[in-house]
Design a protein with these regions (language model features):
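Cysteine-nucleophile active-site neighborhood
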Residues: 47-103
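Conserved SAM-binding loop
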Residues: 4, 41-42, 78
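Short acidic/histidine-rich motifs immediately flanking catalytic phosphotransfer sites
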Residues: 35-45
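N-terminal beta1-alpha1 ligand-phosphate binding loop
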Residues: 2-24
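Short acidic low-complexity segments
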Residues: 26-37
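Short glycine-/small-residue-rich Rossmann-like dinucleotide-binding loops
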Residues: 9, 45-47
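Short gly/ser/thr-rich secondary-structure transition/capping motifs
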Residues: 21-28, 59-60
Length: 103
């Protein structure tokens, strides 16, 4: 099951529509308890880096997603701002990134 993280800034519907058209099992994740059973994670993002980091950090999902990725080895794919969030920081903002990629 693919989990698409919905932290308030993302093209969630686009992912959902694509997965539905190919009958790919997926779940839109809005709360950390919904991450149970997820085998792959999509971290989308649209908009400004700082806004995305603030929203993700206050979503309550960061620690759970981090544990899934690093301890349980669940693959994650960042798309658009979601990919930028995986790095240390962005030239387009002042917030710290997740620091999962040394960039």
């Amino acid at each position: 099951m693919i989990g698409v993280i919905d932290y308030g800034l993302g093209n969630i519907r686009a992912f959902s529509n694509i997965y539905k058209s190919f009958d790919i099992p997926h779940r839109i994740i809005t709360q950390k308890h919904e991450l149970s059973g997820i085998e792959k994670i999509i971290l989308p993002g649209v908009g400004a880096f700082d806004d995305a980091m603030k929203k993700f950090n206050t979503s309550g999902m960061r620690n759970t997603v981090e544990k899934m990725v690093f301890e349980n080895k669940i693959p994650i794919l960042g798309v658009c701002v979601g990919l930028q969030m995986l790095g240390n920081s962005s030239d387009e903002g002042v917030e710290e990134g997740l620091g999962w990629i040394d960039a």
